[in-house]
From Swiss-Prot:
Alphabetical GO biological process terms: cellular response to oxidative stress; tRNA methylation; tRNA nucleoside ribose methylation
Effect of loss of the gene: Increases cellular ROS (reactive oxygen species) levels. Increases RNA level of TRM7, TRM13 and TRM44. Sensitive to oxidate stress induced by hydrogen peroxide and rotenone. Mildly slows cell population growth.
SUPFAM superfamilies: alpha/beta knot
Gene (UniProt): TRM3
Binding residue positions for S-adenosyl-L-methionine: L1365, E1366, Q1367, G1389, I1409, Q1410, Q1411, F1412, G1413, V1414, I1415, R1416, S1417, M1418
Organism taxonomic ancestry: Eukaryota, Fungi, Dikarya, Ascomycota, Saccharomycotina
Protein name: tRNA (guanosine(18)-2'-O)-methyltransferase
Length: 1436
C-alpha cells in the first residue's frame, strides 16, 4: 500500500474517510492503523468508521476467546497464540479512545458475566463478601450492569491476555482510561484460580501507572485498592500465589508512582512491616527478593518525602538521618549475603556486623532475628552451622523475645536439629549451649516471661516425638532458669501443656528418666494461683500416663512436701483437696504423702497404691498387714480377686519380721482347691519373698509343682487369644516359683530309668512350654533363668564327663539356641532386653564353653561361633550385649584358660575373642549421647546421687568398654599355647597384616585393635614359640602397611620379637631384613620404620652390651644411620637427623672411636638447633621404650597418643582400675596426658574471637544491595540489559556443572544468546548450584545435537562469523592482534573430545588460546571465559 503520509497529503478528508471505511470492510486493519497513526485526521466524530472498527475488534476477540461445545469452564486447557491481526487491533484501541471506551464497557460485561457465573468457585465466602464485593458494587454504580446484553461463552484467560497486549501498547502513551475494567480485574488477583490470578498479575505490569494515578486522585478507589491488597496477603496464607500477587502489586506500585494516601496509612501500621518480615523469612527465594525490594523502596521513599513514622518495627522523623539510612543499608547488605546470594566467607567476615545489628538503636531487634532465621534455613549446611554458632553468641537476649513466633517456629526448632548434638569427650557442647541460651533468654526477660514460657512449652509439645536429647537440653534450660532465679512462674495454662508433655515417651529409659524428671521438677515452681488440687491432678496425670508407676515421681516426693509447706496455706490447701478426695485413689495417696491429708478412706486399692509408691507411711501399716493376712487366708473379704495383689508385697513397712511371721499354707491350699491365675501369681511372689527370709516357708514337693503347672496350663488355655500377655505372665510366675523352689530342693536323679529322673522330667516340661504352651517373652525369660540355674548347679566340669551330662548340656544349649534364633529372626525388641542378656549368659555359660573347648558335643563350637558373630554384629547399635559376652568369655578363661590343650583347634574361640575386641559401635549422635545425658541426670537432676549409683549402669549395666577390658583379662588368663595360636591364626586368617581396602578408616581401626591384642599376647607369653614362618609374614607386611597407626604396633611387635631373637642367638634373618629396608631409600616410610625398630632393639639390649651382639648391631646401625642423615629423600634425612637427638645421649658411652664420636656429636649439635617443640615434634619424639612402655595404658592407646595427634581408641587408667581383674601380670600404668600430642586446631574461624573483625571493615557485597531493587517484570528488564550480538553454542557440552558455569559467565559478560542441547538442564541441581540465578536472565535457546549445523547455517545467513574454540593445525592464535567480528558465533566442543569433524567443516575459523605450560588443554568453563571476555573487551 502507498505510504500513509502520501495519502494524507494528496487525498482530501472525505476520500481518506472513504478509504479507511473500505479498508475496514476488507479487514485491512493494519493499513487502517498506519493511516490513523500518520494522518492528522480525526475520525472519532465519524460513527461510520468508529462503529465498524469496534465491531471488527470485538469480532476478532470473540473468535480468539470463544470456547466450543457445551462445557461451561472459565477457560480452555490450551489457547492459540495471539496472531498479528489481534495485536494490530490492540494498537488501534490505544489510538482510538472513543473505540476503547466502548470496548472497555463491552469487555467489562464479558468478564462480569464469567465472574458472576463462577463467583463461589473464584472467591471464598468471607473474602468474597467483605473484600471483593465492593469492587463489583462500584462497577455497578458506574456501569449499569443490569442492561440486557448477549451472554457469550468466552475464555477468561484469552480475554485477559488480549487486555495485557492492549495495556502493553498503551504503557508509554497512557492514552486510555479503564477504571470500570479495574473494578473487575483487580479482584481477580485474589481469586482461587492460580492461572487467572497469575494472568491478572502479568497484566498489571503494564497498567500499574494508571492504577497509581487513580489511587492518588480518587480517595475511594485508593481505599478500595489497599483494603483489598492488605486482605489479599492475609487470604494467601494457604494459597501462596495470592501472597505473591499482593507483594508483586505493592512492589510495582512503589516502583511506578508516588505513595498514595491509603498506602501511606498502610505503611504506618505494624501489619505492613510484619508482612515484610514474614516474607523476608519465607522459604521461597522469590518471595524473599520481593520483600527485600519492597523494604528498600519503602524506606527510600519515606526518607525522600520526609514522612514521620512511629511503628514497632520502623521509626523515622521528618528527615531521616544518614546514620539511620546507613543502618538499613547494612541490614539489606547482610540480608542479601545470608538469604539471597549466600556466601559463607562473606558471612564470616561480617560476623561483628551481624552481632551488632541486635544493638543497633535504629533497627528493631526483630530484623536481626530475620538474619538468623534465614541463615538457619540455608541450603548450605556450613552456613546453618555458622549461623547457629552466631545465634548462641548474641548477648542481647531481649532481642529474641521481640518475635516469639520466629523464635519458636524457626530459631529454637533449628537449634533442636539432631545433627548439631555432637559429643566431645564426655559432654555435648551444643546441648549445653542450648540450655544456657534458654536460661539466659528467660533470665533477661523482664516482661512477658509467662508468654515466652508458654510458647516454649508449646514448642516442646509440638516436638513431643522429635529427637529426645534436644527436648532434654531445651527443657533443662527452663529448669536451670527456675533454679537460679527462684521464680514461681508455672500457671494453669503452663500446667495444661506440661500434662501433654507427660504423654510423650522417650526412646529408652535413660532419656525417659531424664526428661520426665525435668518435667516433674517444673512443678516445684508453680505460681501462687495454682491450687493444691491442680498440682495433684497434674501428678496423677503423669502417673497414669506412665502406666501407674511412681518411679519418676518417687524421688521427688520430699521436694513436693517442702513445696506444700512453703507454698501453700495449710488450711486452704486441705479445704481445696477435700472436694476431690475419694474420687481417685492416686489423688488420695498424693494428698496423704505431699499434704499429710488424714481424712482418707483406706481401701485395698489405696494400700496397693501405697506399696507401689514405696513411701514409708507408718499410719497405714497395720491395715496393710490386716489386708495381707486376708490375702494369705485364700479368701479375702469384700470379694477381692487378687488382681494387682502382688504389688502389695512391695509395701515399704513390711520388714523381715513380717515375712518370718506369716503362714502361707492356707493360701497354698486355696490355690490348689480354687485355682485362679491372679491368686497363683500372688502365691508365687510371696513364696519368693518368704524364701529370702527363711527356708521353711511351706512343705512343697516336686509333684506339687508339676500339678500346679497343669493348673496354670488349663487356666491359661481358657484365656482369649488377645490375652496372651496374661498367659505369658502366668507361666513366668510358675517358672520363677520353680527356680526358687529348686534353690532349697535337690532334684532326685536316682531313678533306674535315666530319662525318668526329676531333672529329665523338668527338662521335658521346659521343652513343652517353649514349643507348645507358651514361648513368649516373660515365660521364656523365666525358663532361661531356670535352665541357667540347672547348668550352674547340676553340671560339673572335669576331665571326664558322663553321657547324661553331655545330653543335659546339649539339650539346654539347644533350647537357648532355639529361643535366640526365634527372637533374632524378628529383630530384637528393645523392651525384651532382659531376655536377650539372659540368653547370652546362657549360651556362653562357662560350662558350655568348656564342653565346646573339649569337643564333647559335635557342632557345638560352630554354633557358638555363629551366635557370637550374630551378637557381635548386633552390638553395633545395641548396648549391653558386648560387655556381657566379653564378661562370659572372661569367666571361662579365668577358670579354664590354663587348661586349654595345644592339640585342639581353638580358632572358633580366638575368632570370638578378637571379634568382641575389635567390634566398632555406632558413631551417630543419639548413641553417643546416652552416657552424656546419664551424667547430666546424675550430677544435675538426681537429688540422691552417690558415686557408683549412675543411671547409665542401672539401665544398661557396665560401660561398653568393659567388653574390651574383659578380652584383655581373657588374654592374660590364657596359657601360652593359646596366645601363640592367636598370633599365628589372626595374622594368617584375618586382614591384620594387609588391609583389604587401604583407604577404609573403619577397617584401619579394626586392624589397629587386632594388633593391640597381638602385642599383648606376645608380651605376656613366657615361652617364645612363634614360628619363623609367621614372623617372616609379619616382617614383610610392614612394607605394604598403609595405616600409620597400625605401623606403630607392627614396629613395636617386631622390635620386641627381634630382641627375643638376639637373646636366643638367632637374629640374623631379622637383622638382614631390617637393614635391607634401611638401605633401600625408594620407600622412605619403611626406612623410618626400620630405623625405629633398630633403635628400640638397641635400647633394650644396651644393659647387656657384652652379650647378644649389641656392639655389632650398634656399629652396623650407626654406619647406616649417618649416610641416611644425608639422604636425598627428605623424610629419611629429617628423621635420621632427629633420631640422633636421642641416639647420642643414649649410646655415646658405647662409642669408642674418636672420629665417629665427633661425627655423631656434630650431627647431634646441628639437629638440636633445628629441633621444634610443641605440636610438631621432631623424629625422636616418635620413639618409645620397649620396657618403659610395657604397661596396659600404653599398649592400648597411650603410645599412639604420645607419637601422633590422630584420634585413636584409648583405655584409661581409671577404666582398667575399675574393670580389670588380673592386675598382676602387666602393670596398668598411668594416663600420661602431659606427653600426649594435641589435635591440630583446624577451626580458623572462632565466633568468640570478637576482636578479630574491625568495626570499620567494609561489608563485602556483590551487588550493591541498597541501590539495587528487584525488577519484578524480568522480561521487560532483560530487554533493558545491554547485550552483545555474540552467540555461544554450548550444545556439545553435556555436564550440568560446566553448563551452569558457562551460563553464569555469559550473563556476567553480556552475551546475546546461549544455546544448550536440552533446556531442561536449567532444572538440574548441579546446574543451579553453579549458575545460581543466571538462567533467569540469560537468553537461552535449545539446539539439539543434530540441529547444530542447521542452526549455524541460519546464523551465517544473518551475517554471523562461525568460530570454533579448538586446537587444529590451522587455528588462529587468540592474542592482542585478533579482532572479533561484531556478529560472532562461538562453538564450544565437548569436554573430552572437542569439536567433531563434521562441525569443524562448517566453521569459518578456529581460535586457539595460547598456552605456555605443560598441560595441553584447559577446563571448558575457563576456556569459554577467556574467549568471551576477549570479545566483550572489544565490543562492549
Amino acid at each position: 500500500m502507498v505510504g500513509g503520509a502520501l495519502i494524507c497529503k494528496y487525498l482530501p478528508r472525505e476520500e481518506q474517510l472513504k478509504l479507511i471505511s473500505d479498508l475496514i470492510q476488507n479487514d485491512s486493519l493494519e493499513e487502517v492503523l498506519e493511516l490513523i497513526e500518520t494522518s492528522p485526521l480525526d475520525i472519532t466524530t465519524d460513527s461510520n468508521i468508529e462503529t465498524p472498527i469496534f465491531e471488527k475488534i470485538t469480532e476478532q476477540v470473540i473468535a480468539y476467546a470463544s470456547i466450543d461445545g457445551e462445557a461451561r469452564e472459565m477457560f480452555r486447557s490450551s489457547r492459540a497464540e495471539m496472531n498479528k491481526a489481534l495485536r494490530t487491533s490492540a494498537q488501534l484501541l490505544c489510538c482510538l479512545p472513543s473505540v476503547w471506551h466502548k470496548f472497555q464497557v463491552w469487555m467489562s460485561y464479558r468478564l462480569n458475566d464469567i465472574i458472576s457465573e463462577n463467583y463461589k468457585h473464584l472467591f471464598n465466602d468471607n473474602f468474597g463478601k467483605k473484600i471483593v464485593q465492593p469492587f463489583f458494587d462500584s462497577f455497578a454504580e458506574e456501569q449499569n450492569a443490569n442492561i440486557k446484553h448477549e451472554n457469550l461463552h468466552l475464555d477468561i484467560l484469552s480475554l485477559l491476555h488480549y487486555l495485557e497486549v492492549v495495556y502493553l501498547f498503551d504503557e508509554c502513551k497512557n492514552g486510555i482510561s479503564s477504571k470500570c475494567l479495574d473494578f473487575i480485574i483487580v479482584p481477580l488477583l485474589g481469586c482461587n484460580s492460580e492461572e487467572i490470578a497469575d494472568s491478572c498479575s502479568k497484566l498489571m505490569r503494564w497498567h500499574i501507572k494508571y492504577l497509581s494515578k487513580c489511587c492518588n486522585t480518587d480517595s475511594n478507589f485508593d481505599k478500595l485498592i489497599w483494603t483489598f491488597i492488605k486482605q489479599l496477603y492475609a487470604e494467601g496464607s494457604q494459597q501462596a500465589w495470592k501472597q505473591k500477587n499482593s507483594l508483586s502489586f505493592l512492589l510495582r506500585f512503589l516502583l511506578a508512582a508516588e505513595l498514595s494516601p491509603e498506602l501511606i496509612t498502610y505503611i504506618k501500621t505494624d501489619a505492613y512491616w510484619r508482612h515484610i518480615q514474614t516474607e523476608l523469612d519465607n522459604d521461597v527465594h522469590e518471595h524473599r527478593k520481593l520483600a527485600l525490594s519492597i523494604l528498600k523502596l519503602t524506606i527510600q521513599k519515606l526518607s525522600s518525602h520526609g514522612i514521620t513514622l512511629q511503628t514497632t518495627f520502623y521509626k523515622c522523623n521528618d528527615l531521616a538521618n544518614i546514620e539511620m539510612l546507613g543502618s538499613w543499608k547494612k541490614f539489606t547488605t547482610l540480608y542479601e549475603m545470608i538469604a539471597l546470594d549466600t556466601s559463607l566467607n562473606q558471612i564470616q567476615a561480617a560476623k561483628q556486623d551481624i552481632i551488632k545489628i541486635f544493638d543497633n538503636e535504629h533497627l528493631h531487634h526483630s530484623w536481626g532475628l530475620i538474619l538468623l532465621s534465614t541463615g538457619l534455613k540455608s541450603s548450605m549446611e556450613s552456613v546453618r552451622k555458622y549461623m547457629m554458632t552466631l545465634m548462641f553468641s548474641i548477648t542481647n537476649m531481649s532481642a529474641f523475645s521481640s518475635n516469639l513466633p520466629l523464635l519458636t517456629k524457626t530459631l529454637l526448632p533449628a537449634a533442636m536439629s539432631a545433627h548439631y548434638f555432637d559429643v566431645k569427650g564426655v559432654s555435648c557442647p551444643h546441648g549445653e549451649k542450648l540450655s544456657l541460651f534458654v536460661n539466659n533468654l528467660l533470665s533477661q526477660t523482664t516482661e512477658g516471661i509467662s508468654d515466652i514460657l508458654f510458647e516454649i512449652l508449646k514448642l516442646l509439645v509440638e516436638k513431643g516425638t522429635s529427637f529426645d536429647p534436644s527436648r532434654i537440653y531445651l527443657s533443662y534450660g527452663i529448669l536451670v532458669f527456675f533454679q537460679n532465679n527462684k521464680q514461681k512462674t508455672i500457671n494453669s495454662d503452663h500446667l495444661s501443656l506440661i500434662r501433654k508433655l507427660y504423654d510423650f515417651a522417650a526412646e529408652e529409659e535413660v532419656l525417659e528418666t531424664t526428661i520426665q524428671t525435668i518435667y516433674l521438677k517444673f512443678l516445684l515452681y508453680i505460681d501462687p494461683s495454682v491450687s493444691a488440687s491442680e498440682l495433684l491432678f497434674t501428678l496423677v496425670s503423669h502417673i497414669k500416663l506412665k502406666g501407674g508407676t511412681y518411679k519418676y515421681v518417687e524421688p521427688l516426693f520430699e521436694d513436693y512436701r517442702d513445696l506444700a509447706v512453703s507454698h501453700f496455706d495449710d488450711l486452704q490447701a486441705k479445704e481445696n483437696l477435700t472436694t476431690n478426695i475419694g474420687k481417685d485413689t492416686i489423688f488420695d495417696l498424693l494428698a496423704s504423702i505431699i499434704f499429710d491429708f488424714k481424712d482418707i478412706d483406706i481401701t485395698p486399692d489405696f494400700l496397693i497404691e501405697v506399696a507401689k509408691s514405696k513411701q514409708d507411711i507408718p499410719v497405714y501399716t497395720s491395715k496393710a498387714v490386716t489386708f495381707l493376712t486376708q490375702l494369705l487366708s485364700g479368701e479375702p473379704s469384700n470379694g477381692y480377686t487378687y488382681e494387682n495383689a502382688t504389688a502389695l508385697l512391695s509395701y515399704p513397712n513390711f520388714t523381715i519380721s513380717t515375712w518370718k511371721s506369716i503362714n502361707v499354707n492356707n493360701l497354698f491350699k486355696s490355690v490348689m482347691e480354687k485355682f485362679s491365675l491372679d491368686k497363683f501369681k500372688f502365691f508365687a511372689e510371696i513364696y519368693q519373698k518368704t524364701y529370702e527370709c527363711r527356708f521353711d516357708t511351706i512343705e512343697l514337693n516336686f509333684n506339687d509343682l508339676l500339678s500346679l503347672y497343669e493348673m496354670v496350663k488349663k487356666s491359661a488355655n481358657q484365656c482369649s487369644r488377645e490375652s496372651f500377655k496374661v498367659k505369658d505372665s502366668a507361666y513366668s510366675s510358675y517358672f520363677e516359683l520353680l527356680n526358687t523352689f529348686l534353690k532349697t530342693y535337690a532334684l532326685n536323679r536316682d531313678s533306674s530309668e535315666g530319662n525318668d529322673d526329676e531333672l529329665h522330667i523338668l527338662l521335658r516340661l521346659v521343652d513343652e512350654n517353649i514349643n507348645k504352651d507358651n514361648g513368649n517373652y516373660l515365660g521364656n525369660l523365666a525358663v532361661c533363668k531356670l535352665l541357667y540355674f540347672i547348668i550352674d548347679s547340676y553340671i560339673h566340669c572335669s576331665t571326664s564327663v558322663s553321657d547324661d551330662d553331655i545330653f543335659i548340656v546339649k539339650f539346654i544349649f539347644e533350647k537357648f539356641s532355639f529361643i535366640w534364633e526365634c527372637i533374632n529372626s524378628e529383630r530384637l525388641v528393645l523392651k525384651e532386653r532382659d531376655l536377650h542378656l539372659m540368653l547370652i549368659k546362657g549360651l556362653f555359660h562357662p560350662v558350655i564353653l568348656y564342653f565346646g573347648s573339649n569337643q564333647y558335643i559335635d557342632t557345638l563350637t560352630s554354633k557358638l561361633e555363629e551366635h557370637a558373630q550374630t551378637i557381635i554384629s548386633l552390638s553395633y547399635s545395641r548396648r549391653s550385649l558386648l560387655p556381657l559376652l566379653g564378661s562370659q568369655l572372661r569367666v571361662f578363661m579365668k577358670f579354664y584358660g590354663k587348661l586349654l590343650r595345644e592339640d585342639v583347634n581353638y580358632w572358633w574361640l580366638i575368632n570370638i575373642i578378637v571379634g568382641v575386641f575389635k567390634q566398632p559401635q555406632m558413631d551417630v549422635n543419639l548413641y553417643k549421647l546416652k552416657p552424656v545425658i546419664s551424667s547430666l541426670f546424675d550430677h544435675k537432676l538426681n537429688n540422691y546421687y552417690i558415686k557408683g549409683d549412675e543411671l547409665y549402669e542401672k539401665v544398661y549395666g557396665p560401660d561398653e568398654i568393659l567388653a574390651r577390658v574383659s578380652i584383655i583379662d581373657s588374654i592374660l588368663y590364657a596359657n601360652d599355647q593359646l596366645k601363640i595360636r592367636l598370633i599365628e591364626k589372626v595374622t594368617e586368617k584375618t586382614n591384620a597384616l594387609y588391609a583389604i581396602k587401604r583407604t577404609d578408616g573403619a577397617e584401619a581401626l579394626q586392624r589397629l585393635l587386632q594388633w593391640q591384642l597381638l602385642l599383648l599376647s606376645l608380651l605376656t607369653t613366657n615361652e617364645k614359640k612363634l614360628s619363623e614362618t609367621s614372623m617372616i609374614r609379619i616382617l614383610k607386611s610392614i612394607e605394604d602397611e598403609s595405616s600409620p597407626l597400625v605401623r606403630v604396633y607392627k614396629e613395636w611387635f617386631i622390635s620386641s620379637k627381634v630382641v627375643d631373637y638376639y637373646k636366643t642367638g638367632n637374629p640374623k634373618f631379622a637383622e638382614d631384613y631390617l637393614f635391607s629396608l634401611l638401605e633401600d631409600h625408594s620407600k622412605p616410610v619403611f626406612v623410618v620404620s626400620a630405623e625405629k625398630i633398630c633403635f628400640m632393639v638397641l635400647k633394650d639390649l644396651r644393659n647387656d652390651e657384652k652379650k647378644y651382639g649389641f656392639t655389632q648391631l650398634l656399629d652396623r646401625f650407626i654406619c647406616t644411620l649417618v649416610p641416611n642423615a644425608a639422604s636425598n629423600k627428605p623424610l629419611v634425612r629429617h628423621f635420621s637427623n632427629s633420631l640422633i637427638i636421642s641416639l647420642w645421649p643414649t649410646f655415646k658411652a658405647y662409642l669408642s672411636d674418636h672420629t665417629l664420636r665427633n661425627i655423631i656429636e656434630n650431627l647431634y649439635s646441628n639437629a638440636k638447633k633445628t629441633q621444634i617443640f610443641g605440636q610438631y615434634r621432631a623424629g625422636d619424639a616418635n620413639i618409645w621404650d620397649l620396657k618403659g612402655d610395657r604397661k596396659l595404658t600404653n599398649m592400648f592407646g597411650g603410645v599412639l597418643k604420645k607419637v601422633t595427634d590422630h584420634d585413636c581408641p584409648y583405655i584409661s587408667e581409671s577404666v582398667f582400675e575399675k574393670y580389670l581383674q588380673e592386675k598382676d601380670i602387666v602393670p596398668i600404668g598411668t594416663d600420661e596426658r602431659s606427653l600426649w600430642l594435641d589435635k591440630r586446631d583446624t577451626n580458623t574461624e572462632s565466633v568468640n574471637n570478637a576482636n578479630i573483625s574491625c568495626d570499620t571493615s567494609p561489608l563485602q557485597t556483590k551487588s550493591g544491595a541498597w541501590e539495587t531493587v528487584l525488577d519484578l517484570d524480568n522480561k521487560k528488564s532483560n530487554d533493558v540489559v545491554t547485550r552483545s550480538e555474540l552467540i555461544v553454542v554450548s550444545s556439545l557440552v553435556d555436564k550440568p556443572p560446566n553448563l551452569g558455569g558457562i551460563c553464569r559467565l555469559c550473563d556476567v559478560l553480556g552475551v546475546g544468546l546461549l544455546t544448550v542441547q536440552d533446556i531442561k538442564v536449567k532444572n538440574h541441581p548441579q546446574f543451579k548450584n553453579v549458575a545460581v540465578t543466571a538462567d533467569r536472565w540469560m537468553p537461552m535457546e535449545e539446539v539439539a545435537l543434530d540441529e547444530i549445523a542447521s542452526f549455524m547455517k541460519e546464523k551465517k545467513k544473518e551475517g554471523y562469523t562461525l568460530i570454533g574454540l579448538e586446537q587444529t593445525d590451522k587455528s588462529v592464535k587468540l592474542d592482542n592482534n585478533f579482532q572479533f567480528p561484531k556478529k560472532s558465533l562461538i562453538l564450544l566442543g565437548t569436554e573430552a573430545f572437542g569439536i567433531p569433524g563434521t562441525l569443524l567443516s562448517e566453521l569459518d575459523l578456529c581460535l586457539e588460546i595460547q598456552q605456555f605450560g605443560v598441560i595441553r588443554s584447559m577446563n571448558i568453563q575457563t576456556a569459554t571465559a577467556v574467549i568471551v571476555h576477549s570479545y566483550t573487551v572489544q565490543h562492549m
